[in-house]
Amino acid sequence: MAKKMLIVHGYSDGSVSFTKLGDYLVDQKLYDKDDVYYIDYASMNDDATFKDFADKLNDDYNRIFKGERIDVVCHSTGALVVRTWLAFRLETQKELNQHFDCPVEHLLMMAPANFGSDLAKLGQSFLGKVRSTFFNTNSRPEDFLESGKAVLQGLEPASPFQWVLSQYDMFQDNYFNPKSQNDLICYPFIFAAGNNYGGSFEARLLKNRAKPGTDGTVRICGTSLNTRKLMLSFKDGKPVNRWYPETKFANIPFAVFDGLNHGSIINPDEEAFSRQAGPASLISKALSVKSAQDYENVAKEFETTSETNYGIMGADYRDKYQQFFFKVRDDVDCLVEDFFLDFIVLNETGERDNDLTSKFDDNFESEFYTHSADSAHRVMMVNYDKLKGFFETLVKAKGKLVFDLTANTPLADVKYIEVRFDVFDGAKAGTKDISFFYPNTTTLVDIVLDRKESDKLLNVKTGDEVKKP
């Protein structure tokens, strides 16, 4: 492990909330007291962005640590702050043709908001601003009636910011690449809380505090970095699909912990924190990783620990979920914000099966979330266990699940071709043949539509045609 540790808080929080965790790391003799550092950042400033935080963090890192490799623990929104910093630092070095370095050796993410929080939209409301101003001990006078608009838009499910950031650190040559030399590799680890705030007074006030598939704040499947990206390109309405090549680790350590929610997962005083299958059992192992082989071995331990936790969870928390994060654009890379995506089940003869279509709509399609500032980005979170059961039904019925996508443009002389894509054909494949369903993950789906322009928009003519009356 590195000699020094930096702890990064989440949205509307502050460093004072993390001193117990820092003291725990010192008590475990993982770091000396003087080598544990904390961050405070203005997450409730409406104008502050993740890039602002990343730039200042980079300056402070250079000033304090002077290029020394450090370890980082981050909570919730802090994960996006750190990932933005790492991406920003490397991209800057590339642009300026500077020497590459990797400032972070071990990155421990506690309940990270890697792919969204259902509370982020509420935080942008007037009620959210009042709460941030009058009921938050971390609020600042200069942020009066502010709640961090730019940060919260980045935190929303289906955030364009999350899409772009993922492109940097998961699908390009970045710090999570096992093929890099060892001192240019950052080893990330995901510690996800497995319980929400169900039954609490807060959950009675805010229903999303007890939303299934979440830890009361972030989506559990959205904490994982085991993300895949699929491009669906439609030329003349015909689909061509391609999985983006991955540069990151094939299996980033991920574990879900029973008995802990979004807030309590950072509290070492919690009984569930230190139990045999709790986070404490894996923190020291994560920090001891020195090579890609070590990392692979620890990833297996995370997986085993996660399954142990699922085995002792209550029925309300045991189901696993998956997110499908859609971005719709056209073949000239313009975002398509006005579109309708409809899932349909066809029977063996190719006709619509109304019963199975209704069953899919009732159980899955209602989970679509559209980003508040950019409707070209949408996400659907589905219960993986229910989805698997639905596909078993399709196999028995020899049915096919497809989606139809229709879209409009603001230009009357530009049209999009309506498209259809076969998601799963129960007559041809069994459930074991499903290639794009992975529990506790987010799958990015990049949909590219074919646009057609009329001659009224632009028309190339011959000389004779021009001279015709």
Put a short name on every predicted segment.
Residues 322-330, 343:
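A short, amphipathic beta-strand motif
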Residues 311-312, 328-335:
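Short amphipathic, basic-aromatic surface patches that mediate peripheral association
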Residues 332-353:
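Short, ordered, surface-exposed loop/turn motifs in non-cytosolic proteins
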Residues 297-316, 404-469:
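Extracellular beta-sheet/turn segments enriched in Thr/Pro/Gly and aliphatic residues
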Residues 151-155, 160-165, 352-399:
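Tryptophan-paired
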Residues 87, 101-310:
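Helical cap/lid subdomain of alpha/beta-hydrolase-fold lipid enzymes
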Residues 5-11, 36, 50-170, 200, ...:
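Serine-dependent carboxylesterase/thioesterase catalytic core
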Residues 1-38:
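Short, surface-exposed "cap/lid" segments of acyl-processing enzymes
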